[in-house]
C-alpha cells in the first residue's frame, strides 16, 4: 500500500497572481490567509509519522502551494537529510512538486535531479495563452516559466506541463499543442478551470461541453 501525503510548505503564499486562481481567492477569505512557511519541526514530525506507518511501503510526497519553492532551497535540502535519517526501512520514496516555474534556476534543477523529483510546471501555452498568469506586480511570467522548463530539460529533470483549460486556451488548443510539441514537452495535463469565489471577465470558467471540445473521442 502506498502512503501519499500532500504538503504545502509555503501555505498559500505565491509570487504570482493568476487571474483565475481559486486558491488565492479562497485563502484571502479565510480568517488566517496564510500559515507561513513550514518549520523543520513540522516537516520532521510529518515524515516520522509517514515512515512509521508505511513500514516498507512506498511513501509519496507531493509539495504544492501557493508556490512551494518559496519555502527555499534549504528547506528541500533539509527534506533530503530528514528522509535519509528517518527512512530506516529504506522504503521507496517519491517526491513531486507543483510549481509555476518562475523561480527555477540551475541550483533548483540540481536539487530536483538529486532527489529524483517529478516536477509539475504550470504553463497554459504560448505567450498569448499564458497571459492570465501574472506576477504580484502585474507583469507577465511566460518567459520565466519557459526558462524554468528549458533548464529542467538541460539537467534531465522529469517534469510535465499542467495546463489550466480556460476558454482562451480551449479556443486556441491546436496552436498551443503545436507550441508544446515544438518545445519537446512530452507530458501534458489539462485541467478545467475552477470558479473562484469572485470571477472577473478576464478568466471565465468553462463548461463541461467546452472542456470536451478540444478532445474529441
Regions found by a protein language model. Give the residues of each.
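Glycine-rich, flexible loop segments associated with nucleotide phosphate handling
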Residues: 36-40, 92-95, 208-211
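A C-terminal junction/extension of Radical SAM enzymes
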Residues: 199-217
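Canonical Radical SAM [4Fe-4S] cluster-binding loop centered on the CxxxCxxC motif
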Residues: 2-41
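Radical SAM/AdoMet-radical enzyme domain recognition
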Residues: 47-48, 52-62, 71-198, 203
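Activation loop
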Residues: 42-46
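Active-site neighborhood of divalent metal-dependent phosphoester/pyrophosphate hydrolases
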Residues: 66-67
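Conserved structured core elements
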Residues: 12, 37-41, 106, 139, ...
